Amino acid sequence: ERFYRLSEGDKLMLLKRATLPKPVPPGMRAAPAVLAGIVKGKAEGPPPPAMEDLWLVRDARGETGWMLGRIMEIDAPDALVRYSEGQRIVGAYVLTTVNDPDAPQEDKNVPEYVTAVGPYKSGLTYDFNQIRVFTWNVKKHRYETAFRDKNIEGYLPVEVKMATDPYGKSPVDAAPAPTFSYRVLSADAPVVVPDPVTGAIVPGKTILKTYRLEGNLVRRVLAPGVPVPGAAHPVAETEKKVARGQRRR
């Protein structure tokens, strides 16, 4: 084993995540597996153990190692954090920049981002549950949501590049544009279970989603005639509909 000392503010690249039960502090015993209570005549089991996430990271020197997720902060602009809706930004990636002479910030070349977002919770079997693209409105001088893919079980990395649409036939398709790709768990994949020893999270069947940013529009890149594969959802669609109905009341 080898330990590396990092300075506060050092930049790190997230490579892979693992999740394990949080160690019990010295002198304390793990809570016994007893019934937590009875609700509507049904016995409830003990609560699951508290989990702790670890990330395999790489620093600027090329050194790699595991680091506790709770002591890291994602390097995301404050302008995006305010739109996070109480969720944690897992990654923010620049797609392109637009020039706005009247932008409130000092740098008038404003970056546009694709972000991966997830709950503030350890022990999840996915890295993020939402992808959002933020474009800059040069008339209103603010960020706006141009695209959102939510209720997904997504996995890093998010890859960004300039690329053409290999399936398109228009001049717009032939021109390189900011393109991003990420993987989500397939609807017919088995439930992901972290390795009990290493905590490694290895999804089964995944779907590669690829999109292009064309101006302020985000369009999926798909081969013609190919059916869109179904993706797994961390929250069942029926549960979401019921929740929306309750809010309307």
Where are these regions (language model features)?
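Acidic, small-residue rich beta-repeat scaffolds with periodic aromatic anchors
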Residues: 38, 43-46, 80, 135-249
